[in-house]
Amino acid sequence: MREIVQIQAGQCGNQIGSKFWEVISEEHGIQSDGFHAGGEDEHLKRLQLERINVYYNEARDGKYVPRSVLVDLEPGTVDTIKASPYGKLFRPDNFIHGQSGAGNNWAKGHYTEGVELVESVLDVVRRETEGCDCLQGFQVTHSIGGGTGSGLGTLLISKIREEFPDRMMCTFSVVPSPKVSLTVVEPYNATLSVHQLVENADEVMCIDNEALHDICFRTLKLTQPNYGDLNHLISSVMSGITCCLRFPGQLNSDLRKLAVNLIPFPRLHFFLVGFAPLTAKGASSYNRITVPELTQQMFDAKNMMAASDPHNGKYLTASALFRGKIFTKEVDEQMHNIQTKNSSYFVEWIPHNIKSSICDIPPKGTPMAVTFIGNNTAIQDLFKRISIHFQAMFRRKAFLHWYTLEGMEELEFTEAESNMNDLVYEYQQYSNQETEEDGGEYQEEHEEHEEQAEN
């Protein structure tokens, strides 16, 4: 089987990671004790178990154990997961935690506290990979604004890349939001992380809390969304992206096929993700939804999980992962229509740049759904925003001593910043022919912010 090992790093990574396991366990009929629920329907049972080895290891007693490594630099989140209803699902040895925490400091996660823990994490990762017949790759859940998910998360990614250079590395990265800021040093942590992700990851699914909040307010009409609601949205996307890997389907996919179809140039592997139809936690969508409606919704900026409007850029490539009893012909027609009617939103030099796949098994609570992955040049907005905040602080050397005390040098910050700015420039270059104009605008915007910061 084509196995995938998941690594959850930091508080955010562990929370969205454990929610993902809850969702897919339910889809595969795995109970919280790890045993299959059984049932009368032999056909359903066969579908649920046929490719379950991708994410689960079957123990001798018939228990299914997630191929997951749970890492944090403090015990709090890991202990909460152990005590949760699904805590007994995981292998106890796969919980690894330090005592001191990273204190929202990337350098602590990457250089000091993280280094002490990294070898024991890699031992567990090696043990998990040895239990695989044919390892497909790794899936990492983390945030890039804190200390552990960003610092230790990127350290693990680079170490795993060294040891398994030919396996896929896919990350679900929660990016700092412009409005929902949790700590003042987020721009530093995020810039240093993006620098690592450009070099060492194959696919990065960008998610941010502001976009998730907007979905909860506008679409789901939740007045006070909590992290449970946000994690529900993230887990819907994760379940959708991975369903073709976990279930037998008409058009199956794997991490490498996804990458080959979505990444025209190796550095441009940062994706916008979306989901339709959007439903609140615990709610079900009983309205009969059609494939044309799903297609329209999935390209809507309101359904995107990152605060970046795809209409500000162009699609280099996109992938639509449909779920439910859907005819291939209908999907192909819709994809063709979208590209014909909205040709201005797609680059001309990649023909037929939407890939689609279909998985027969719908998610819980709705008869059909679609998950969307787009390689859109508008993703540069995320990086520009981080860069502007980074520059405002770095010019004053604000908060820098927290990083230099851990042994970092200023040069690392400069390198990370220029790598991220290069990435923005590359996205601009491929977005249209008027590259100079775009570049000029970005330069002016930067100079404007520099002047504001200096005044």
Swiss-Prot record:
- What transmembrane ranges does the database entry give? none
Q: Which residues make up the binding site for Mg(2+)?
A: E74
Q: Where in the cell is it found?
A: Cytoplasm, Cytoskeleton
Q: Which Pfam families match?
A: Tubulin, Tubulin_C
Q: Which InterPro entries match?
A: Beta-tubulin_BS, Beta_tubulin, Tub_FtsZ_C, Tubulin, Tubulin/FtsZ-like_C, Tubulin/FtsZ_2-layer-sand-dom, Tubulin/FtsZ_GTPase_sf, Tubulin_C
Q: Which family does it belong to?
A: Belongs to the tubulin family.
Cofactor list: Mg(2+)
Which SMART domains does UniProt cross-reference here? Tubulin, Tubulin_C
> Gene behind this chain?
tubB
Molecular-function GO terms, alphabetical: GTP binding; GTPase activity; metal ion binding; structural constituent of cytoskeleton
Going by the UniProt record, its keywords in alphabetical order are: Cytoplasm, Cytoskeleton, GTP-binding, Magnesium, Metal-binding, Microtubule, Nucleotide-binding
Positions that bind GTP: Q11, E74, S143, G147, T148, G149, N209, N231
Q: What does this protein do?
A: Tubulin is the major constituent of microtubules, a cylinder consisting of laterally associated linear protofilaments composed of alpha- and beta-tubulin heterodimers. Microtubules grow by the addition of GTP-tubulin dimers to the microtubule end, where a stabilizing cap forms. Below the cap, tubulin dimers are in GDP-bound state, owing to GTPase activity of alpha-tubulin.
Locate the compositionally biased regions of type Acidic residues: 434-455
Question: What is the protein's name according to its record?
Answer: Tubulin beta chain
Where do the record's region annotations for Disordered lie? Answer: 426-455
A Gene Ontology biological process noted in the UniProt record is: microtubule cytoskeleton organization
A GO cellular component term found in this entry reads:
cytoplasm
State the PANTHER family in the record: TUBULIN (PTHR11588)
Assembly mode = Dimer of alpha and beta chains. A typical microtubule is a hollow water-filled tube with an outer diameter of 25 nm and an inner diameter of 15 nM. Alpha-beta heterodimers associate head-to-tail to form protofilaments running lengthwise along the microtubule wall with the beta-tubulin subunit facing the microtubule plus end conferring a structural polarity. Microtubules usually have 13 protofilaments but different protofilament numbers can be found in some organisms and specialized cells.
